[in-house]
Amino acid sequence: MPLGPEERRFVRLIWLLYSTNPYPPSGEGTARQRRRARRRWRQQQDQIRVLVERLQEQVYAVDRLADEAQHLAIQQLPDPPHSA
């Protein structure tokens, strides 16, 4: 299924968030600083997961609409009368 502009924006955002949010290094800073870094990282990962779920919901909604549209049929209409 081709992605629309909104879905492409979500995919780019998710990719950017994942690529710019590495797990915090261990061994740097005090224990409190490391805990805070891990907490911030988890919060950012939760935001990414919310975006991914939102994107998946939209994709499923579009798929359902496409399935429903396949069941629709155009009513057969008679040909228009020809002028003589």
Swiss-Prot record:
Renumbered residue ranges of the record's region Homomultimerization: 13-21
Keyword Translocase: no
Main location: host cell
Motif Nuclear localization signal and RNA-binding (RRE) positions after renumbering to this chain: 30-46
Superkingdom of the organism of origin: Viruses
Residue interval(s) of motif Nuclear export signal: 65-77
GO CC terms in record: host cell cytoplasm; host cell nucleolus
Alphabetical list of Pfam families matching this protein: REV
Subunit structure: Homomultimer; when bound to the RRE. Multimeric assembly is essential for activity.
Protein name: Protein Rev
